């Protein structure tokens, strides 16, 4: 264990994260850096793992131009000196395994740019986001969901969407917040004769300005649905009523949240320098 004194003068013991090594292999780093891994979300972000027999969370983020990246949160009083990540120079990926951390923990990345400026950023690959905590990322539990939509999935294989009529019920974020019982809501939609629902702003968006087109999290469903599992329950309930679900989200515009993708590592890493 290591004993660390934070910026508030409080001392806390941690299991040494640097004694456990890292989880990504050299081949994975090579594929990620080359853009050849089409399921990068399974490696980037925060994932519960067992490393060296110890359960914890693996963090990985691409920030090739950053001087330093640290994992910060309430667990270390948002002090970037406590959990700096290991940088792999060949790939530009920062990685850290934090022992004993659990799903549900809110976190961000503190990124030190060349020149010394510091920004605190949301994880680009987080699968859960909490807009109420300044768009903090949340470690999502890797627990398989018990889907009950086998009949709907089988029917979809033979469905001709070009010939079958469609009646789509568009659901606003305000409506989503009011859904407490997905099964009851799905039954109501089915009774009205709709074949599909369309979820506005399915991906996490900039709710500060209520701009549904400013995507703030490309891998995290909007927290208006509750947790990702709450959204899965809604989709599951709709499919059981033979209702399709259309997810409406903007892939082309990320907005300008200070904690977002713009100027992520002190350069135009994710956006064009022309904007």
Give the location of each predicted region.
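Substrate-binding/active-site clefts of carbohydrate-active enzymes
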Residues: 130, 144-146, 150-275
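Short beta-strand elements bearing conserved aromatic residues within extracellular beta-rich modules
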Residues: 69-71, 107
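Surface-exposed loop/edge segments in extracytoplasmic proteins
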Residues: 77-84, 117-120
